[in-house]
Every structure is written in C-alpha cells, then in structure tokens.
Amino acid sequence: MAENSNGALGCVVRCLSSESELQELCREEQLCCAELGVTRKNLSDFEVEYLWNYKKVQDQELYLVKWKYYPDSESTWEPRHHLKCNNLLKQFHLDLERELLRRAKAAGTKKTAVRCPRRLDQSLSHYLVLKAKQRKRLRQWAQQLNAKRSHLGLILVENEVDLEGPPRDFVYINEYRVGEGVTINRISAGCKCRDCFSDEGGCCPGAFQHKKAYNNEGQVKVKPGFPIYECNSCCRCGPSCPNRVVQKGIQYKFCIFRTSDGRGWGVRTLEKIRKNSFVMEYVGEIITSEEAERRGQIYDRQGTTYLFDLDYVEDVYTVDAARYGNISHFVNHSCKPNLQVYNVFIDNLDERLPRIAFFATRTIRTGEELTFDYNMQVDPVDVESSKMDSNFGIAGLPASPKKRVRVECKCGVSSCRKYLF
C-alpha cells in the first residue's frame, strides 16, 4: 500500500515477490518485519520445512533438511539426533516406504516390506521433494477451506495415492451462488407456532399440505420424493426448533481424500452418522438451463458431472458445482449409495429453486466413504403408496447430474450398473 506526500493512502501495487521470498530476504539481511512474521525472537531460528534426502554413513543416519524461510540452496545435511521434528521424520520414512513398495509392485515383485537403502537415488529423492511440497499445498488448502466454511464440521485433506495437489480454480461456498438471469425471492412470512411439533396444521409443512419431515431427533421420516419444508427466518420459533435441520449446516467432520481406484477425490466421514440424519447440501452456482446446455458441451470434453438439474416441478434452473461448491463437489457416485437426496424449502419457496440436501440411507461408519447415486430413481410403488397430493410423481425427485455422455462407473459394488448414465 503506497502513501502520497501528504501521508494519505494511495494506489495498491501488487508485490512482485511471494511471502516466503520476502521472509527469506529479511533473514538474509537480518531485518525484522512483523507483517511477515519475522521478529527478533525468531530471526535466527531454524525450523525444518521438510526432509528431502537421506543417507547412512557408517552407522549414522543423515537427512538433507530444507529450512523454512531459506532457499533450497541452503539446505544442509543433519544427523538424526540434531532433529526434533519427529512427525516429519515419521512421515518421511512412511512416504519412502510407500514409494519403494509401489516401485517393487510395478517391477512385478510381491514384497510386503522393504528395507531403507543406505543412499537414495536421484529419482527417489526427487519424489520425496515433490511429496513434501504437495503436503504443504494440501495443508494450506485445508486451512483455506476451513477459513471459508460457515458450518460446524471440520474439513481435512489427505492424499496418500499420488502427487495430485489442490484442484485449480475451485472456490468453496456455503450456499447457492446466484448466476446471471436467476432471481431468488426470500420469504416474507412464517409460522406463529410456539411448539412446531404440537401443531400439525399450522406449522410450515402443514401450510403446504405436507407432513412434517423430521422426528424429534432431527432425522428425516418422509420417503424420498416428498419435499421438506423447514421453518424459516420469519417464523416465531427459535433456532432450537426441531424443524430446523438443513439450515444448521454440516455437523460432521469430513476428509477429502484421493481414491486409489481412479475415481479422483472422494469424501469420507470422520464420525459415525446415524441413519436418516442430514449430512450435507449440494451447493454451487445456480444457472439457467440454457447456460447449463452451453457449459455442458464444455464439461462433456472434460468428462465431469457437476451439473445438477433443479427439476422438482420444471426444468428451468441447474446447479453447477464445477467451480463454486462445497464439500459435496468431491462426493463420488455409487450404484449402492449411502446418501439420499431430498428437496428442501426454507427461506425461498419457489418450487423451481429447491435446496438439495443429502441424508444418510443407513448408519454410516467412521472412516466410510460418502456416496450418492448420480442417476437416482425412486420405486414407483413406494411413491404411490405414500402419495400425498395429485402432483407428486417420479418427476418430483431432484434430478441427477446432467445425463450428457456415457460414463463408465467405477463404484465397484456387486450391483454396479457399469455406467453412470
């Protein structure tokens, strides 16, 4: 930020050096800069950023250390007993062992354990540098995701499969982003209930001739295909109302992880999720169907499936989560999923613009991957037996992502349909 001769703030000039480069410069010149985190206290400190080579000389283990805030050229060999970074040492050897096993498998051997060599060849050392830098980028990405999330659930990121880093040009959002030609009108009226569960006829679902969707524990009890009407910002009831579930956001800790079977990124839960519990929303940019057709032609060439029609009553709008989205962007398809989609209405009652919520179809164990069916359908017998009004039918379900190209399914379940669409 520049200042003019009168001390007033002037134009903003983009810095030509990165933050780490400026930190390195400060340390080289022995200059303190509070804005860069370089103070007198840590000016001469040495912090290990990562380990990127290893050798064993006689009986002494030595590690080539990249020091934080210093260029690669100033990396030094250090004996193990000088290093206090136990987690980095453990991760270094874990990465090394995994890569050695991968190479052994590629060579056709069936080793289940490998011995660390006395010296690493150049390709191994190069791999460990790339892996260390990737971990740094993924940590930074996880920090960015958690800084942007407005929900309770924490997000972790993990890649123990390859060297893929954070996706480019992906922006984390917590609610729909309204695109050109789309207008969302917020509701101006709400229920007057003091206890929304005691008055079946007067609360928000009853006003639209529908049953309450949740039980007292916030678990969905209506069948897939029926809409969910939650209490809104104009309702008299408070935030503890049992009819406020989706609007409270994600409550669970999740991990975005790299799959080992070619399905890209996936999402696993780090907590047990009970059957019929709300898990997450599918959010993205709301665009017109015409714009979706245009973008779809581009996505066809990329093999992506982030376009999700909002055709609860008519196909007018589409959610595009390719660039703007939340953690649902990374949820994979399965022909036998553990998530089910519901249309939800809260502060906007336009039936062309429902919110899309995922609920657990069964109890989901800690560490289990979350999936939904990209080509979801409902049993017509179930629809007919639980029919609530003459307008309900198969078309009442939220659509799957746009069915544009024939994509091979890799879900691996016994009932796999072989193709997504």
Swiss-Prot record:
| Pfam short name (any one) | Chromo
Quote the cellular component terms of the Gene Ontology held in the record: chromosome, centromeric region; nucleus
Which residues make up the binding site for Zn(2+) 3? Answer: C196, C231, C237, C241
The residues the record assigns to binding Zn(2+) 1 are C191, C193, C196, C203, C204
What is the name attached to this protein's record? Histone-lysine N-methyltransferase SUV39H1
Localization, per the record, is: Nucleus; Chromosome, Centromere
Query: What are the binding positions for S-adenosyl-L-methionine in this chain?
Result: R263, G264, W265, Y306, N332, H333
SUPFAM superfamilies in the cross-refs: Chromo domain-like, SET domain
Q: Report a single Gene Ontology molecular function.
A: zinc ion binding
Q: Which residues bind Zn(2+) 2?
A: C191, C204, C231, C235
The SET domain covers 252-375
Q: Which reaction does it catalyse?
A: L-lysyl(9)-[histone H3] + 3 S-adenosyl-L-methionine = N(6),N(6),N(6)-trimethyl-L-lysyl(9)-[histone H3] + 3 S-adenosyl-L-homocysteine + 3 H(+)
Alphabetical list of SMART domains matching this protein: CHROMO, PreSET, SET
Quote the EC number: 2.1.1.355
Q: Which InterPro entries match?
A: Chromo-like_dom_sf, Chromo/chromo_shadow_dom, Chromo_domain, H3-K9_MeTrfase_SUV39H1/2-like, H3K9_Histone-Lys_N-MTase, Post-SET_dom, Pre-SET_dom, SET_dom
Q: What task does this protein carry out?
A: Histone methyltransferase that specifically trimethylates 'Lys-9' of histone H3 using monomethylated H3 'Lys-9' as substrate. H3 'Lys-9' trimethylation represents a specific tag for epigenetic transcriptional repression by recruiting HP1 (CBX1, CBX3 and/or CBX5) proteins to methylated histones. Mainly functions in heterochromatin regions, thereby playing a central role in the establishment of constitutive heterochromatin at pericentric and telomere regions. H3 'Lys-9' trimethylation is also required to direct DNA methylation at pericentric repeats.
